[in-house]
């Protein structure tokens, strides 16, 4: 294991405070946009905190999964995955229920010439997600 890999593993170690918080959190966790820059690490950190807390709670991730191997990597960590295009209303409606939704989906890079898609991802989609998960706690997180 090289220095980068060691540092990455250290960052995935849940703190005592996180373990206590996740133990008190009601319901499962759904991460929309799990395939982005922050998603995989966040999903793994949540799953490790759940395991350390000794509780039974699902961590689920939704993405288009365009990165080869990511879906398998998340499965190996005990994270359920759901390939979906969040802009497709039928696919969004078919996603599992969750009391806790982390919204990480968005468009930041490669937006030149793709302004309409950027608008849809960053403006239209959050409203659709809020409607779909209106009975859930939603945290929107963006870089």
Residue ranges of model-derived segments:
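Non-catalytic terminal and boundary segments that flank Rossmann-like NAD(P)-dependent oxidoreductase
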Residues: 1-30, 52
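Conserved Rossmann-fold NAD(P)-dependent oxidoreductase catalytic core, especially the SDR/UDP-sugar
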Residues: 28, 100-103, 108, 120-143
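N-terminal Rossmann NAD(P)H-binding glycine-rich loop of SDR-like oxidoreductase domains
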Residues: 30-48
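NAD(P)H-binding glycine-rich loop region in Rossmannoid oxidoreductase-like domains
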Residues: 40, 68-69, 73-121
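Alpha-helical structural signal in soluble globular domains
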Residues: 45-49, 73, 77, 128, ...
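Short, conserved loop/helix-junction motifs that constitute active-site signature segments
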Residues: 52-54, 95-96, 129-134
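Short beta-strand element of Class I
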Residues: 57-60
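N-terminal Rossmann-fold cofactor-binding loop
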Residues: 62-66
């Amino acid at each position: 294991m090289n220095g980068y890999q060691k540092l990455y593993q250290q960052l995935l170690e849940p703190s005592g405070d996180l373990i206590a918080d996740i133990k008190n959190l009601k319901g499962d966790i759904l991460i929309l946009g799990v395939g982005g820059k922050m998603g995989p690490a966040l999903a793994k950190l949540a799953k490790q905190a759940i395991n350390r807390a000794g509780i039974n709670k699902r961590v689920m991730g939704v993405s288009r999964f365009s990165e080869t191997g990511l879906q398998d990597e998340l499965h190996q960590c005990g994270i359920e995955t759901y390939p979906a295009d969040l802009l497709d209303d039928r696919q969004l409606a078919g996603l599992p229920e969750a009391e806790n939704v982390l919204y990480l989906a968005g468009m930041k890079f490669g937006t030149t010439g793709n302004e309409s898609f950027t608008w849809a991802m960053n403006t239209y989609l959050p409203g659709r997600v809020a409607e779909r998960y209106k009975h859930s706690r939603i945290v929107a997180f963006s870089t």
